[in-house]
Amino acid sequence: MISNSQLDLGISFVGSGSATPQKIIKNDQLGQRVDTNDEWIQTRTGIGQRRVIGENESLIDLATDAAVNAVKMADWDVQTIDLIILATSTPEDLFGSAPKIQSNLGASNAVAFDLTAACSGFLFALVTASQYLASGSMKRALVIGADQLSKWVDWDDRKTCVLFGDGAGAVALESSGDESGLIGYDLKSDGSKGGCLNLSQSNVFLDLVQGANHQKGEYLPIKMEGKEVYKFAVKEVPIILGEILEKCQIKSESIDWLLLHQANQRILDAVASRFSIPSEKVLSNLKYYGNTSAATIPLMLDEAVRDKRIKSGDLIACSGFGAGLSWGAALFYWHGPY
């Protein structure tokens, strides 16, 4: 566990960006492949469609576009970016995709690396970047969440194929000294329950030389115990958010927006109900994108900023949760130009 009480970290959220693939797959289209339909999916998940990366697109393209949009909103010169963290579980290059984004941006002065924490990845990356900025060693950081789970979905598994989509989102963080954006956070993991949701390596071994073999480099499709993940989320997310609010001495009625990982509308509604947060303060775009893993939070944040729902000075309670099992939460003020 890593956490803080209310601290003036002097870190501002000054820009956001997002990007999604062009190809849309609607619920009824999935019903042509597996035994499901639009009503069944929407009733149980809130998802109406999802977007998937096609032949002329890539995860790095989406992540770069999201980063460019965040940099433009922040009005930064790319040469002043010190750090780029890409939160992803589906890199195009297992040795690291963030440096390719750095190159695409022309941010030659930035350190760039990947971070993996599944659907909690964006929050883990956010806290990691904030630590660098709070130390004084860096001033500006891009935090990107991007995933392409469509390539790891078993499209004949009704339990999982209806849930996931592809996308990217980014935020620009700045060490401001006197204006605190991030005021509280907490991160947690429980590996004992990791089997509830995983994308594991295959257990296939091939002969190498006499007396020795090697494991084949391939992964199995996503496996999920939906009921267990739901119970985990509706139990742990309210606890971790409640602890942060208590530490920061902020009442739930002071929250302007509840921004949760976009996994299932029932989870969003259950958490909001625990804090008596009205539905109009709960941010959701599940209907249009489904679960885009590490991208859901920054993608939703950017949409709400650009359509003027989120305004400068708004207080946002945020939580991510997913495979690992891992979960986290953050409380921050938005200080962007919109």
Swiss-Prot record:
Catalytic activity: malonyl-[ACP] + acetyl-CoA + H(+) = 3-oxobutanoyl-[ACP] + CO2 + CoA
Region (ACP-binding): 262-266
GO CC, any one term: cytoplasm
Any GO BP annotation: fatty acid biosynthetic process
Pathway: Lipid metabolism; fatty acid biosynthesis
Keyword field contains Acyltransferase: yes
Entry GO MF terms: 3-oxoacyl-[acyl-carrier-protein] synthase activity; beta-ketoacyl-acyl-carrier-protein synthase III activity
EC number(s) stated in the UniProt entry for this protein: 2.3.1.180
Sorted UniProt keywords: Acyltransferase, Cytoplasm, Fatty acid biosynthesis, Fatty acid metabolism, Lipid biosynthesis, Lipid metabolism, Multifunctional enzyme, Transferase
Active site: 119, 261, 291
InterPro entries: ACP_syn_III_C (IPR013747), ACP_syn_III_N (IPR013751), FabH (IPR004655), Thiolase-like (IPR016039)
A family per Pfam: ACP_syn_III_C
Source domain of life: Bacteria
Subcellular location: Cytoplasm
Annotated signal peptide: none
Enzyme class: transferase
Function recorded in the entry: Catalyzes the condensation reaction of fatty acid synthesis by the addition to an acyl acceptor of two carbons from malonyl-ACP. Catalyzes the first condensation reaction which initiates fatty acid synthesis and may therefore play a role in governing the total rate of fatty acid production. Possesses both acetoacetyl-ACP synthase and acetyl transacylase activities. Its substrate specificity determines the biosynthesis of branched-chain and/or straight-chain of fatty acids.
Record HAMAP family: FabH
Subunit structure: Homodimer.
Family to which the UniProt record says this protein belongs: Belongs to the thiolase-like superfamily. FabH family.
Comment, domains: The last Arg residue of the ACP-binding site is essential for the weak association between ACP/AcpP and FabH.
Protein name: Beta-ketoacyl-[acyl-carrier-protein] synthase III
Gene name of this polypeptide: fabH
